Design a protein with these regions (language model features):
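Terminal amphipathic alpha-helical/low-complexity segments used for targeting or macromolecular assembly
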Residues: 1-104
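Structural signal for interior beta-strand "rungs" in well-ordered beta-sheet cores
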Residues: 100, 104-145
Length: 145
């Protein structure tokens, strides 16, 4: 069964999707989130001059919210309560080398959720980048966007 079919079948029965869902669905959703994270797939893109929404990608993101429980994360200045798979964000645990390899600048107070893509030479001023976002190369997301 294709990735698209797995997601569409799960979507039709989304009221049954939970943290107890089978591993094949979890693996499929996680693969899509990983692919979003590296820019391999996009929720929407311009094809032949027209914007196209890839519904199965959008559905996979929405299913992920049903699949993962809420968790608490305590930091030195605050605490957060969010879905477990998104809590720590895209750059959690990154070294200086990881940031240099990614090639984008993010100033403090610019959380970037896992499952979002940020291109090289992008600049993130204080902003919030949600799962599914695609920030192309050289783009600036300005303060509080």
């Amino acid at each position: 069964m294709s990735i698209e079919n797995i997601i569409n079948d799960a979507w039709e029965n989304r009221d049954q999707v939970s943290p107890n869902s089978d591993e094949s669905l979890k693996n499929t959703v996680n693969q899509i989130i990983d692919d979003l994270d590296i820019g391999k797939v996009r929720v929407a893109e311009k094809i032949n001059g027209e914007w196209v929404t890839h519904q199965h990608i959008k559905k996979a993101i929405m299913l992920s919210f049903r699949m993962y429980p809420m968790e608490n994360l305590n930091g030195p200045y605050s605490s957060w309560y969010d879905k477990a798979h998104l809590l720590k964000g895209k750059t959690a645990g990154w070294s200086k080398e990881d940031h240099e390899k990614a090639g984008f600048r993010m100033v403090p107070n610019s959380p970037v959720r896992k499952g979002s893509f940020v291109g090289k030479n992008a600049v993130l001023m204080p902003c919030y980048v949600n799962i599914g976002a695609y920030i192309d190369e050289g783009t600036m997301i300005d303060t509080f966007a």
